Amino acid sequence: MAVIKMKPTSPGRRGVVKISRDHLYKGEPFAPLLEPQFQHAGRNNNGHITTRHKGGGHKHHYRVVDFLRTKDGIPAKVERIEYDPNRSAHIALVCYADGERRYIIAPRGLEVGASIMSGAEAPIRVGNTLPIRNIPVGSIVHCIELQIGKGAQIVRSAGTSATLLAREGIYAQVRMRSGEVRKIHIECRATLGQVANEEHSLRRLGKAGAKRWKGIRPTVRGVVMNPVDHPHGGGEGKTGEGRHPVDPWGNLTKGYRTRNNKRTQVMIVSRRKK
């Protein structure tokens, strides 16, 4: 994939960097695998904002992606690679030998016409999904399950991958892109290869309006708010925080670790690098 730098014909185009999509399918998505997606603008069922900076954006359907990959032993052929507005990764439409079609996360190097398979007996090839116990140590994997049969939960974004370091008993050690080493049950599944669209991090939207197209609203600094709205607010003229930086609810930010999940703490062998 090529990186396209736009000509500075206007201030809004000057800093735009796009990723070429020439290799992607140009037609409509596969209709039976589409679902309506309703806009909630970050509100919950009470109308309260639970996720800030969300609202607006272009309407689009949700593509139902198969994260379980449970059609074991049935080969599938890649029909096309598509753009998905709901995620940074590209998706591939595959057709199984029994005629069923499903979307999967497209790994790097997967091409139209390639054959993929899932299950314990699947060959060691990019795009195939196997239990971790059947994957060679040192392999690059993505779309990893954290609980047996729950479906892929981590390493699903564009360009991401994890490395299978070792197997000890019923657990395997996997190193994430962040540097964290985590224990995962060997019966959990993972897909071989790296997620495609690795140039996604190089793109630049170039203007505020492009963020609004994505449904992202402005992020306002706390120091320019009133005291009722943020702990950093208030003061006469330009003033600083006057305290250690905190979020709108008073929790320390800028480096303070807030993780509090003792249930899965024992599964982390080495914390992620800062």
Swiss-Prot record:
<dbReference type="Pfam" id="PF03947">
    <property type="entry name" value="Ribosomal_L2_C"/>
</dbReference>
<dbReference type="InterPro" id="IPR022671">
    <property type="entry name" value="Ribosomal_uL2_CS"/>
</dbReference>
<feature type="region of interest" description="Disordered">
    <location>
        <begin position="223"/>
        <end position="256"/>
    </location>
</feature>
<dbReference type="GO" id="GO:0015934">
    <property type="term" value="C:large ribosomal subunit"/>
</dbReference>
<dbReference type="InterPro" id="IPR008991">
    <property type="entry name" value="Translation_prot_SH3-like_sf"/>
</dbReference>
<keyword id="KW-0699">rRNA-binding</keyword>
<comment type="function">
    <text>One of the primary rRNA binding proteins. Required for association of the 30S and 50S subunits to form the 70S ribosome, for tRNA binding and peptide bond formation. It has been suggested to have peptidyltransferase activity; this is somewhat controversial. Makes several contacts with the 16S rRNA in the 70S ribosome.</text>
</comment>
<dbReference type="InterPro" id="IPR022669">
    <property type="entry name" value="Ribosomal_uL2_C"/>
</dbReference>
<dbReference type="InterPro" id="IPR005880">
    <property type="entry name" value="Ribosomal_uL2_bac/org-type"/>
</dbReference>
<dbReference type="GO" id="GO:0016740">
    <property type="term" value="F:transferase activity"/>
</dbReference>
<dbReference type="GO" id="GO:0003735">
    <property type="term" value="F:structural constituent of ribosome"/>
</dbReference>
<protein>
    <recommendedName>
        <fullName>Large ribosomal subunit protein uL2</fullName>
    </recommendedName>
</protein>
<dbReference type="InterPro" id="IPR014726">
    <property type="entry name" value="Ribosomal_uL2_dom3"/>
</dbReference>
<comment type="subunit">
    <text>Part of the 50S ribosomal subunit. Forms a bridge to the 30S subunit in the 70S ribosome.</text>
</comment>
<dbReference type="InterPro" id="IPR012340">
    <property type="entry name" value="NA-bd_OB-fold"/>
</dbReference>
<dbReference type="GO" id="GO:0019843">
    <property type="term" value="F:rRNA binding"/>
</dbReference>
<dbReference type="InterPro" id="IPR002171">
    <property type="entry name" value="Ribosomal_uL2"/>
</dbReference>
<dbReference type="Pfam" id="PF00181">
    <property type="entry name" value="Ribosomal_L2"/>
</dbReference>
<feature type="compositionally biased region" description="Basic and acidic residues">
    <location>
        <begin position="229"/>
        <end position="246"/>
    </location>
</feature>
<keyword id="KW-0687">Ribonucleoprotein</keyword>
<keyword id="KW-0689">Ribosomal protein</keyword>
<keyword id="KW-0694">RNA-binding</keyword>
<dbReference type="InterPro" id="IPR014722">
    <property type="entry name" value="Rib_uL2_dom2"/>
</dbReference>
<dbReference type="InterPro" id="IPR022666">
    <property type="entry name" value="Ribosomal_uL2_RNA-bd_dom"/>
</dbReference>
<comment type="similarity">
    <text>Belongs to the universal ribosomal protein uL2 family.</text>
</comment>
<dbReference type="GO" id="GO:0002181">
    <property type="term" value="P:cytoplasmic translation"/>
</dbReference>
